[in-house]
Each structure stands twice: as structure tokens, then as C-alpha cells.
């Protein structure tokens, strides 16, 4: 299986640069995973594809404003940190630009000394381990000084930080939003509950590896990044109940999908658990829990389009993506959505 097999042509102007005003009015492509048949809807129509007793799985991670602009304490030279993941209480793995200024022992100041970052170690793939020194509560300082770590393909400025959060975001820790969830409003979620659909919240903190291109020619040689996840007993019970009753488990986003497929046993049973996952889902994978997926339109040759192809076949996916281009759907993080049923 070659990485180039997952390539498609995408005009630059179809990459959404800003979120639309009304989250639920984005477009929705409906893709039948068996026949490849396609329908065109609006996202709030998603309720038509959810039935009483089904379980909708949402990732309630919250994006942290992980991009910090500061200066080297000794020289005043400008520096940019991008926090990737917390390794200990006040210690983070981070990408640093320019890297040559970030030798072990170097200290950097953010917000006129409100936050001091010290390089304590070098990590894999050119990142650094940073120990932070501060007075107060780290999350509050970060909220004040940090910027949202938007994906590299978004060049427009984001004026409201909350537009890059789901309305149900709860647990801080992500370097990117679980973007399929951006389409839901409180009103739509309430209507879904009223229909008798169970909602299960899981947590997976999205790392920047989600945007990292697959650089190997053979898909099987790709090494996935590691991400932290949590599944509560309540969420596990809701998912198990749906499966036991012959109902559907519908994941909102690839992160929810990767969480439940990591957290279940070989029989597809869920339990309360947490840990790190490097699960890589590509065509040939046998899903143990997932029945349907709600997701955005992904980058060519990415692990995300490979995951989607595992559900309904590469040819169906590429056909749907070409149809989306023809119909001028908006792509990537702030773009439109599809449900694979």
C-alpha cells in the first residue's frame, strides 16, 4: 500500500480559512460505505442519520493556546515555542524556532517575565523539553500569553479563540481541535438527546502529529505519533449498551474513533481506561466498535484519509473527495463535513 495511492488534487481556494458564522449550517456530504452513493445535505440534518438508542461519541478535549512568542533572557533574541504535550507538572515537550537558540540551559522570557521557560533536555525530532517557572496558575498565564496553534494551511488570523473550540470542550491538552466537533451547537446537541440518542464523551489530546505528512513511500512503514486518551466508566457503559442492543456507535471525528478503538478489548467491549495510543488505522483494519463516522475533509496522503478509507474503501473515499471538489465543498479544519454510514 503506497502513500501516493491516497493523493487527490485540491484547489487552494477550497481550503477554508475562517469558520462560518453558524456552526451547524456548514455542508454535509452523506456517503454510503457499502454502495459509495453520495447525498448532499446541511450539517444540522445530521440528526436524520442518528436513531434512538444509538451512541454518539464526542471528544471533549480543549485546545490550549500553545503558541508562545518570547525572547532569550541573555540577548533579547526573538523565539517561538509551540507546546506539544505536558510530560510532567511544569514540564512540556515543545517545538522551538529558531532551534539553534534553544540549547540546554538557555532561558526564555514570555510576557515580560511573567513566564520563564528553561530548556532542560533535547527530545526526538528536534523538539525540546522545557521547564516553566512562574507565579500563579499556569493555565491562566498561558491563556493570557498564548495564541491558538492553527494548522499551517490556515493563514488568516483567528479573532475569537472559542471558534477553534467545540462547544463541549472541557479538558485542556490539545495542540489542535478535533475539528469534526466544531459543527455542533448546543441546540443541535439538545435535539439529538431529545431523539433518544446517547452521548458519550471521551478525551484524546490531539498532537501536532495530526498535521505531520506521511513521508514514507510504503504506508506500513509510517510511525504514528503518540497521544494521551481517557475513557470514563460512564462513556464505556453507554457505548457498550448501544452495541449490546444492536444500535450504532457513531464517532465524531477521527480522534474519537482512534480513542474507542484503542480503549476496547478484542471483542469490542469498552471499560474505563486511560493511556497513550499510537494506533494507526488504514485499509484492512477491522473495526471493533465504530459503525459510522462524522468527519471533515482531510489532507491528501494523510493518516486521516487513510483512516476514512479503512471504513469504506479508498476508491469510495477518493470518488467522494473528487465530488466534493466539483461541488466546491470547503476543506480541512474550518471546512465542511461528511458522515460515512
From Swiss-Prot:
Pfam families assigned: Queuosine_synth
Can the keyword S-adenosyl-L-methionine be found in this entry's annotation?
A: yes
What's the EC number here?
A: 2.4.99.17
GO annotation, biological process: queuosine biosynthetic process; tRNA wobble guanine modification
Q: Which UniProt keywords apply?
A: Cytoplasm, Queuosine biosynthesis, S-adenosyl-L-methionine, Transferase
Entries under InterPro entries matching the protein: QueA, QueA_dom1, QueA_dom2, QueA_sf
Any one GO CC term of this protein is: cytoplasm
Where found? Cytoplasm
Main location (coarse class): cytoplasm
Instruction: Provide the reaction this enzyme catalyses.
Output: 7-aminomethyl-7-carbaguanosine(34) in tRNA + S-adenosyl-L-methionine = epoxyqueuosine(34) in tRNA + adenine + L-methionine + 2 H(+)
Q: What class of enzyme is it?
A: transferase
Give the highest taxon in the source lineage: Bacteria
Please state the pathway this protein functions in, per its UniProt record.
tRNA modification; tRNA-queuosine biosynthesis
- A GO term, aspect molecular function: S-adenosylmethionine:tRNA ribosyltransferase-isomerase activity
Function comment: Transfers and isomerizes the ribose moiety from AdoMet to the 7-aminomethyl group of 7-deazaguanine (preQ1-tRNA) to give epoxyqueuosine (oQ-tRNA).
State the oligomer form and interacting partners. Monomer.
Homology family: Belongs to the QueA family.
Record NCBIfam families: PRK00147.1, queA
Protein name as catalogued: S-adenosylmethionine:tRNA ribosyltransferase-isomerase
Q: Can you name the source organism?
A: Clostridioides difficile (strain 630)
